[in-house]
Amino acid sequence: AYEWLSEMNETMDPAYVTDEVIDGMTNAEKDIAVMYSGDATNVLTENMDMSWVAPKQGTNVWIDAMVIPKNSNCPGLANKFIDYIISESVQSQNAEWVGYTPVDKSVEEELAGPDGEFFENPAFVPRTGYHLDETFHFDEQLKAKLSDLWNKVKVQ
């Protein structure tokens, strides 16, 4: 990846940005971007000339999580908040706002169905079970190496 990004730096004028890419893609100011499926869902909702592609070579799979620290002062309140967030109505509202696939299958089916907010939006329900997709687990040594290479790419 380092060599590919270095070569890209020499042949193109890439922009290494974060959330700014969402508006850039929505407004068709950029030709390609790496983004989370929820962000892509929102881009496609605003601009159907864009498309969502998961590479045949595989991609990383991510899962957002809600956790309660062991030393929490209010674990009961934290659990109530999580219960609220995963309630059907709030999952639906949250998914409509952020574009991320809800954990409740019935909410997903409603939003992705013919009368749903994200009908025929390929980014809303990303593929699952693809044999080349991975969930990455970084160790400190690998994280340091990746950070070093990324910094070299950005300063080229």
Where are these regions (language model features)?
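Ligand-binding pocket segment of bilobal, Venus flytrap-like solute-binding proteins
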Residues: 1-55
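Non-transmembrane alpha-helical segments in soluble domains
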Residues: 2-6, 22, 26, 34, ...
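Sec/Tat-exported extracytoplasmic proteins
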Residues: 8-12, 29, 37, 44, ...
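Soluble non-cytosolic domains of exported or imported proteins
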Residues: 16-19, 27, 72-76, 88, ...
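Short beta-strand->loop
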Residues: 48-60, 69-72
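Short amphipathic alpha-helical segments
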Residues: 64-66
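Mature extracytoplasmic/periplasmic domains
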Residues: 69-130
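Conserved C-terminal helix/tail region of periplasmic/extracytoplasmic solute-binding proteins
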Residues: 126-156
